[in-house]
Swiss-Prot record:
It comes from Pseudomonas fluorescens (strain ATCC BAA-477 / NRRL B-23932 / Pf-5). Keywords: Ribonucleoprotein, Ribosomal protein, RNA-binding, rRNA-binding. SUPFAM superfamilies: Translation proteins SH3-like domain (SSF50104). GO terms for biological process: translation. One of two assembly initiator proteins, it binds directly to the 5'-end of the 23S rRNA, where it nucleates assembly of the 50S subunit. It comes from the Bacteria. This is Large ribosomal subunit protein uL24. Part of the 50S ribosomal subunit.
Amino acid sequence: MQKIRRDDEIIVIAGKDKGKRGKVLKVLADDRLVVGGLNLVKRHTKPNPMSGVQGGIVEKEAPLHASNVAIFNSETNKADRVGFKVEDGKKIRVFKSTQKAVDA
């Protein structure tokens, strides 16, 4: 079970976007996350009249490593760590500071 999943609210704890918050759009296999509005890079694209792509300089989100982000606990308004608990035979994610379920 992954500690950070899609649609989790995270906060960046290291790097150029340190302190910024965002929502996880995609989780990649090599411990990387694509976060909405963070770690923006500029990509130069060629125009392609066949598919209707105009071309030019496009800003898009690049993946961040999972070690540079922490899950955001809206109850405490701080970054938090994730632990696991077994309730009713199911493994659930909990915040380490409050022991409350992440998905609740």
